[in-house]
Curated annotation (Swiss-Prot):
It comes from Caenorhabditis briggsae. Keywords: Developmental protein, DNA-binding, Homeobox, LIM domain, Metal-binding, Nucleus, Repeat, Zinc. Gene3D superfamilies: Cysteine Rich Protein (2.10.110.10), Homeodomain-like (1.10.10.60). One of its GO terms (biological process) is neuron differentiation. It is found in: Nucleus. Specifies differentiation of the set of six touch receptor neurons. Binds cooperatively as a heterodimer with unc-86 to sites in the mec-3 gene promoter. Residues 214-273 bind DNA. GO terms for molecular function: DNA-binding transcription factor activity, RNA polymerase II-specific; metal ion binding; RNA polymerase II transcription regulatory region sequence-specific DNA binding. SMART domains: HOX, LIM. This is Mechanosensory protein 3. CDD domains: homeodomain (cd00086). InterPro entries: HD (IPR001356), Homeobox_CS (IPR017970), Homeodomain-like_sf (IPR009057), LIM_Homeobox_TF (IPR050453), Znf_LIM (IPR001781).
Amino acid sequence: MEVLESKPLSAISMVIDAIGVEHDSQNKCYCCNEQIFDRFICRMDNRSYHENCVKCAICESPLAEKCFWKNGTIYCSQHYYKDYSAHRCAGCKKGVSPTDMVYKLKAGLVFHVECHCCTLCGRHLSPGEQILVDDTMMTVSCMSHYPLPMDDPCPPVGPSDVPSCSSDASAVAPYPMDESFPFQIKKEVDAYGYNFEHYSFSDFCDDDSRMLKRRGPRTTIRQNQLDVLNEMFSNTPKPSKHARAKLALETGLSMRVIQVWFQNRRSKERRLKHLCNYLRHYEQRGLIPPPIHFRNEEMDGTDFNSFCGNFEEEDDED
């Protein structure tokens, strides 16, 4: 009888011991290597922590609500993005946090607002200001550091930025751009967190420039077909696929030709709008805008019919 009573007690003791060993191994703090007896336990990547041990490894600030874990190390938001952000500031070379206010240039460079300064004189560069961008060194500088002659009011534009818009190449780049001076004139295209107007010389170039796109088969549209397309564009600048199919049946043109025609027409409208903003930008400051040359055709500011008859097919889809 006594033997029978001792066996269940022995089994229960073994179970309790086993549970105790497992409990100790799971509730051991990974940071301080001490046993956790707190009511609440923090767990990350199958590792347990005291609440007080969850702090940034750099600034040691306590992280009660949110933390970042990388290679076994805990970081706060500021230091995590500073070291491991996918986007780096071209000025200070530090990471960019999602809450940081930054400038994004057309060359793909990103700057903190406080880091957007001239690399030569240290002057802070304002949004919309013409600047010199060195894609190789990832730096920006003022226009005053560009070697311009005194009798030329219009700064030359690098050939890699703006395609030749005139039959005379010297009208666009009258001064050679050799490898010893790799700067290129660019405009700020976007400013995160701000709503600035932007202007780009490349927006005013003609579609016929070979540097903008490859040459494709040309299609000539008859006047009656053009009238139908213009009427549709005045009502719906971006028709649906079903509407383009109806136009194809009505005009006899292929859907691809109709699609490209609407793409080019919308592009002309946008270019004209940018041109008006570009001229207004100078007029508001009492300045005379530099001349803009277009190759093979003179652009009419109010009538598009003169250059909508012939166009090149593009590869872009709606």
